[in-house]
């Protein structure tokens, strides 16, 4: 293109002038500097600890030269491979995944992005660019292709100005969005990833960002394009083709199931790479930080083979038996000790675990965590809606707890416990349960979930009834469930009572027999 020709000639001229102005001694000194052997450093890193390899029963992952690396299963968030996943490292152009995600969320694909002089000339000379001139404009869709396929830095800057108003304000948006995704090891200072000491991330954080990015099919399609033809318009007069340097995307390395990815490189970060692939319904995200070319691609292939070959993704509701998740409503809240105003709970159907193929689901460690404040808020809101005659929950499903699964101490997935929001039976029971009462305040209602019970100002008899109600209760589908610890306690108490009764009756029988014997002796003496 003409603009490239002009810039090329200008670059040569500037380089010649700079060279002619530099003292010879400086150049001589630079040539004598000892060069860093990055490949030797990468080779040494292959002996570093791989944290996931220390998990008991976990498949042993490969030794790679990357400083930081992670393999994450997208649906469950399970980390299958971990090497320094929380270490602060420089991301380079994989930063653009976050910029692209924000653009997709904040802008319309048809919006126009006009490029200012600041956007065009703020980037480093010689860095990735498509040669946009100040005043020209692209659609957001074209900009995203330029961002992800050609890694165009001036396009990243233009998108940042479009969203944030200026390059200085946009990093606040980046850091806020990263935090919302659960990132705790990152700090972003620019939209493109050009080097800044305060611009860093971790393998784990980049996996979280990529996980969200590749959850959007349109974004995944853009990031999986080997080429893109940029059409001319009245705002951008040139036609040209963009080429993707990601070898698993452009076909240089063939690999089944690639969904997209992003390359990155600056001198201080070395090679960085993010890639997403899916096979048999299992989506894996691989992040490589600080590696040497072409091993960032070789590492990725090796980790994908490791993940797809050794792990399986399981839907929790297909395997969980301990919490009777196959039956909806395995938990409930009661308006009173008689069970009136029962409110159904269920377990989310979109929860997954990802575990080694050699480990059975039944062997996993599970832990139920409740949000007590949220549960009580749900009860109060629901009862108030029921008493007002509403039969539909205003806010739909509400998460009031979570079941966490792990292999030892290593998390492998979770699922939410939901309040279903079905008030059809609540309204009827509420009317019956509050008839004749002076107050309908929900604050005094007992709350039951799991093995935790709450009640206020109840009589001893009421307490006994409430205890029995807690042991035997039914789900929304009518299935009966037992609280095993409480049932065992009840059996012990019942056994003790039975023993006492037997002893008492035995003693009474002994006394009666003794009286009979005395009467017989007296009667016999009289007869004699």
What are these regions (language model features)?
Residues 496-513:
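Alpha-helical transmembrane segments
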């Amino acid at each position: 293109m003409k603009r490239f020709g002009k810039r090329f000639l200008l670059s040569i001229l500037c380089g010649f002038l700079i060279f002619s102005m530099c003292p010879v001694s400086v150049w001589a000194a630079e040539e004598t500097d000892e060069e860093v052997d990055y490949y030797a450093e990468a080779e040494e890193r292959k002996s570093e600890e791989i944290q996931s390899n220390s998990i008991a029963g976990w498949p042993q992952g490969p030794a790679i030269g990357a400083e930081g690396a992670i393999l994450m299963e997208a649906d469950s968030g399970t980390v299958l491979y971990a090497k320094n996943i929380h270490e602060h490292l420089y991301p380079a152009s994989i930063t653009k995944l976050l910029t692209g995600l924000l653009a997709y969320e904040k802008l319309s694909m048809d919006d126009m992005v006009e490029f200012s002089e600041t956007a065009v000339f703020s980037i480093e000379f010689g860095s990735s660019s498509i040669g946009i001139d100040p005043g020209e404009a692209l659609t957001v869709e074209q900009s995203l292709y330029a961002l992800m396929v050609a890694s165009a830095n001036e396009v990243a800057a233009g998108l940042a100005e479009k969203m944030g108003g200026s390059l200085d304000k946009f990093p606040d948006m980046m850091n806020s969005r990263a935090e919302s995704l659960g990132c705790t090891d990152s700090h972003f200072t620019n939209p493109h990833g050009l080097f800044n000491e305060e611009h860093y991330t971790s393998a784990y954080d980049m996996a979280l960002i990529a996980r969200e990015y590749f959850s959007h099919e349109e974004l995944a399609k853009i990031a999986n394009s080997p080429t893109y033809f940029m059409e001319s318009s009245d705002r951008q007069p040139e036609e040209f083709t963009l080429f993707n340097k990601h070898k698993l995307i452009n076909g240089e390395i063939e690999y089944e199931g690639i969904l997209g990815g992003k390359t990155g490189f600056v001198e201080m970060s070395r090679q960085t790479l993010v890639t997403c692939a899916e096979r048999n319904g299992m989506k894996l995200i691989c992040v490589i930080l600080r590696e040497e070319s072409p091993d960032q691609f070789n590492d990725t292939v090796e980790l994908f083979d490791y993940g797809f070959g050794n792990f399986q993704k399981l839907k929790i509701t297909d395997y969980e038996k301990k919490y009777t998740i196959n039956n909806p409503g395995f938990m409930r809240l009661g308006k009173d000790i008689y069970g009136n105003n029962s409110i159904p709970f269920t377990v989310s159907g979109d929860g997954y675990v990802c575990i080694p193929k050699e480990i059975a689901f039944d062997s996993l460690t599970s832990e139920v965590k409740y949000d007590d404040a949220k549960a009580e808020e749900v009860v109060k809101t629901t009862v108030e809606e029921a008493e007002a005659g509403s039969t539909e929950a205003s806010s739909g499903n509400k998460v009031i707890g979570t079941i966490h699964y792990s292999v030892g101490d290593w998390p492998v997935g979770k699922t939410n416990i939901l309040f279903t929001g079905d008030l059809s039976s609540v309204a009827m029971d509420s009317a019956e349960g509050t008839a004749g009462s002076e107050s309908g305040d929900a604050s005094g209602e007992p709350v039951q979930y799991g093995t935790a019970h709450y009640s206020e100002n109840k009589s001893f008899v009421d307490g006994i009834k409430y205890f029995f109600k807690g042991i035997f209760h039914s789900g929304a589908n009518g299935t009966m469930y037992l609280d095993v610890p409480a049932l065992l306690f009840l059996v012990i108490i019942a056994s003790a009572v039975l023993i006492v009764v037997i002893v008492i009756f035995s003693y009474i029988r002994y006394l009666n027999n003794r009286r009979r014997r005395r009467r017989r002796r007296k009667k016999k003496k009289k007869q004699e």
